[in-house]
Structures are given as structure tokens and as C-alpha cells.
Amino acid sequence: MNIYKRLGIRTVINGNATLTRLGGSIMPPEVVAAMADASKHFVDIIELQKRVGEEIAKLTHNEAAYVSCGAAAALTLSTAACITGLDATKREKLPLHPSPGRGGFQPSTMKSEVIVHRHGRVGYDFAVRQVGVSFVEIGDENGTPPDELENAITEKTAAIFYFANPSREHLWVPYEQAISIAKKHDVPLIVDAAAQLPPPENLWRFTQMGADLALFSGGKGLHGPQSSGLIVGTKSLIEAIAFNGPPHPFIGRGMKVGKEELVGLLAAVEWYLGQDHEQLQQSYEDQVTYYTEVFKDIQGVTVHRSFPSEAGQPMPRTEIRFDAEELGITRDEILQQLQAGNPVIDIAGTGANGVLINGQTLRPGEVEIIAHRLKEILCSIDC
């Protein structure tokens, strides 16, 4: 029996995105097999982390790499690394707030600020703040002049963070200029690119531009273990990340990465880089064409190509708009009926009357299931 049936859990057809709440992505057999193989033996975790990092660094054309416990943990560990380096005394003082018996925060010796774009903030930046740093925001709705970034840098600046999203980047200091400013002041620049795969070139694009670190989710575009993340960048900062990370009893102790996840992410990177990404892109285009054909004769329904995808990735999605007055059913009622079925169908709403279907997370045959279920709902009203 399927484990989810035994537990009474409905499975989900995920036409939404590589969302954590839905399980991220589906691991290919190669990744599952690698994890199962890793589970059969005891190993030295520190040694395994080092070797896996070396292999991933080679695959991704980077100086060094580290496997974290998800992308949020990557944010925390990267911030910690920028503050402590390999200084054990500083490591003991994280997080940066008064703590009896730990020495507390000493502003004269500890960097405590991170620079971010005001219109680049995301809901996950708590993972940076939990180290105890404060954010210095730059820019506004009209953009960010480079000198504003430079003027924000002080002796307290630990790092400059970019939360990558191509749809917002016109409001930010361009990467190349920001990297030049950061290097001038010897401040690390870090790019959180958790969902920015595809394109696969992003695994080395940011660091080749000069970013000190780039962070990715292991369980989104890479199709690795959901509880894994990938950090690539300079050897010195990767060493400082490992210094703060598990199994050491400091700020990263609770962010453990098992031997299965370590080996699984290596297998995922190998698998991902071996895929035909042009063919995958074409398959997403074909889905838009398919839905357009399926719904072309249904009054009150229109289909459009939406681009880019939800986090600015260069992938098309299918946007379907519903005329509630003509159909006699609202978009939200349609979404509720999709959620009520078995399996659940989870797609994103957009605007007042539209939905978006993301092909990145659909398995073979599920495109047709979604189309059939939508037609079934619409035909129950008037067909």
C-alpha cells in the first residue's frame, strides 16, 4: 500500500511551484538510490561534507561548495561566516545579542549590519536576522543609485545580500556595480538564488561575476532532498560556513545535514546538469499550447502564455482566466473544487479571475488530469 494511503493523506498534483508546503520537488530515481546507498553505512560527516563539497564545486565551476540544511539555513550560516571567519571567540558570541554567560554582543569587535535593497526584501530574510544582525535598507520605488550602496557601508557591515528575482532587479544596483563596490570595501556580497534554477548556468553565473557566495535550494529546481541547500563560492567563506555549521555545537548545530542528504544532493547536481534543458523548456511551451487548444471553445475561458515564472525564472506558465459572470462560477470556487478532490490539484491564483499552471512540477499525465478536472468543473455549471 502507498504510504500516504496508509496514513490517510491525499496526494497532490502540484501545478503551482516548487513550494516547501507541497514537498518541493520529486526526486529522480538516481537521487533516491544514492540516498538509500548512503544510509547503509556510518561515515565521518565532516569528511563527507568536505568531499561532497569538492565534487559539487568541480561540477558547478566554483572554488568551493557546501551542503546546508535547506536554503534558509544557508542564509543563516553564510551570515555567521561573514561575521566570524574562523575566529572561535566570535563564533561563541553568535547570535549577536546579550546572553548571560556567553559574553554578549561587543560592537567594537563584531560586525553587526547587513545591507539589503528595500525592494529586495523577502519573507525568508528572517534567516539572516536570526544571527542577530540588523538590516540597513537602501533604494526605493524609483531605484537605487550605486553611491547609496557605497555610502551605506561602514565598519559594522558584515555583508551585502541580494535576494535574486529578475522581476525586481531593475530597482537594484546592478550586480556588476555592486560587486565592484563590495570588493573595494572588502565586504562579502551574497546572492540568495534559492529558486533561480533554471537556468542551470546560475550555479556559476553569480560567482563568476564576482559574488562571494550564491545560495540555492536543494529541493526545488535541483530535484534533490527537500531538506538540503547548496552554497557555492570562495573557499575562505565556505570554510567559515563549515566552522559555524553542524556538527559543531554553535549557531548551526540545529541545521544538521545527514549523510543521505549530502550524497543525495551530489547525485541531484549530477542529474540536473545532465538534463536536456532546452527540451524541458519546450515541454513547458507545449503545455501552454495544449491548454489553449483544450479550452478554445469554452465561452468565458481564455488561455494566455505567462512569462517568466513565479520567482522570475525564464520559464513559461499557462494562465487561464475565467469570466465569473458568464460561467456562473468564480475563480476561487474553481480553486476550492480542485483542492477538494482526490488527488488534490494545487495551482496558483492570479489577479481577480485567473489561475497559473506551472509545468516545472508536473509529472507525466498530470497536464491532462488538470485539464480534464477543470473542464469537469466548468461543465457541471454549463456545458
Give residue spans per PLM region.
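Conserved PLP-enzyme active-site core in the AAT-like
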Residues: 1-27, 50-68, 72-272, 292, ...
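Generic N-terminal amphipathic, Lys/Arg-enriched alpha-helix
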Residues: 11-21, 30-39, 315-320
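Phosphate-binding loop/pocket of nucleotide- and phosphate-handling active sites
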Residues: 110, 382-383
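Conserved C-terminal alpha-helix-loop-beta "cap" of PLP-dependent enzymes
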Residues: 3, 294-372
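Glycine-rich phosphate/diphosphate-binding loops and the adjacent beta-loop-alpha structural elements
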Residues: 271-277, 355-356, 360
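Conserved PLP-dependent catalytic core of the aminotransferase class-I/II
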Residues: 59, 273-307
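N-terminal alpha-helical segment of soluble enzymes
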Residues: 38-46
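A common structural junction motif
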Residues: 248-249, 338-345, 375-382
